[in-house]
């Protein structure tokens, strides 16, 4: 029960923060310039379901969370490890719930 309350409080905080319009123009401009500089510095990310075995920290971000490089051994007797960028199920459900709440109130 406590975990549910903590997750709910976290979601409410994220939604209220993302929908707040308290950033003034100067801070918004500074933030945009910092983000532009960061994106020019960043290397290309690995899209979801693509091979990430070369760099396990290169997975792209979804709308809220970063995908995780998940490694597994495929069925069929091949002992070669396969790694792909995937979104964990709990994060997928949190994104869907947040989107539904935003659509409901926004």
UniProtKB/Swiss-Prot annotation:
Residue span(s) of the pro-peptide: 21-41
GO molecular function, one term: toxin activity
Predominant place of localization: secreted
Compartment(s) where it occurs, according to its Swiss-Prot or TrEMBL record: Secreted
Disulphide bridges, residue numbers: 45-60, 52-69, 59-85, 71-83
InterPro entries given in the database record: Spider_toxin_CSTX_knottin, Spider_toxin_CSTX_Knottin_CS
Keywords assigned: Disulfide bond, Knottin, Secreted, Signal, Toxin
Matches recorded under Pfam families: Toxin_35 (PF10530)
Organ and tissue specificity: Expressed by the venom gland.
GO cellular component: extracellular region
Domain of life: Eukaryota
Segment forming the signal sequence: 1-20
Domain notes per entry: The presence of a 'disulfide through disulfide knot' structurally defines this protein as a knottin.
Family to which this protein belongs: Belongs to the neurotoxin 19 (CSTX) family. 02 (D7) subfamily.
Protein name per its UniProtKB record: Toxin-like structure LSTX-D7
Lineage: Eukaryota, Metazoa, Ecdysozoa, Arthropoda, Chelicerata
